[in-house]
Amino acid sequence: MVGMNDGGGGGVVRVPGLADETNPTGTGGRAVEVDYVRCFHRHEPGENQCSSAVSKHIKAPVHLVWSLVRRFDQPQKYKPFVSRCIVQGGVGVGSLREVNIKSGLPATTSFERLEHLDDNEHILSIRIVGGDHRLKNYSSIITAHPETIDGRPGTLVIESFVVDVPDGNTKDETCYFVEALIKCNLKSLADISERLAVQDYTESIHH
């Protein structure tokens, strides 16, 4: 995982030191991640906001990973904390969804709007517009980038966010909490994508 933490101040997410134990491409790969963040993950955190980004290298081709990520109407396909999702109307920029959270978390419902969806560049952006949780003015961007891992097609996924810091919490505490949720989501995304990739590879051999 890569944590790229910005305590506020505007502009793109700052990337201090990168440490990614799952990075198969070494230092050069980390430089690429920094470039992707600067190009695609532009946030303007206010004085009482924090912004950060998390990355994950997945041993599955980008089209497969993206087929899960792009489903604004079905985040439960890979997000383990989502029990169900209801979309009002069709799926497109401006669409709203009601996301129900599984019991055990300090929230039950989140209302979210689709801000941007680009199937060519593999970019998805959402904004939380309501719900019984503490993630106020939360906005996120997730991108998927093709790469090669162990000689096979792989995907680098980066998810960044900006959010208000709740009363009684520090910027570091808020970023740590959100990063932990994103890491769980990306681990689940990797597990599911890699399992599907193995199935596809096995089927191609038998055919």
Task: Put a short name on every predicted segment.
Residues 82-86, 174-175, 205-206:
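Short amphipathic alpha-helical segments embedded in low-complexity Lys/Glu-rich regions
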Residues 2-92:
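Hydrophobic ligand-binding cavity/cleft-lining segments
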Residues 57, 63, 70-136, 196:
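Glycine-rich portal/gate segments that line the openings of hydrophobic small-molecule binding cavities
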Residues 39, 187-207:
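Short, highly charged C-terminal tails/helix-capping segments
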Residues 53-57, 108-111, 139-143, 158-160:
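Well-ordered beta-strand positions in beta-sheet-rich domains
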Residues 63, 67, 73, 112, ...:
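Amphipathic alpha-helical interface elements that mediate macromolecular binding in regulatory proteins
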Residues 3, 125-184:
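Beta-strand/loop substructures that line and gate deep hydrophobic ligand-binding cavities in soluble
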Residues 47, 51, 58, 103, ...:
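Amphipathic alpha-helical protein-protein interaction segments
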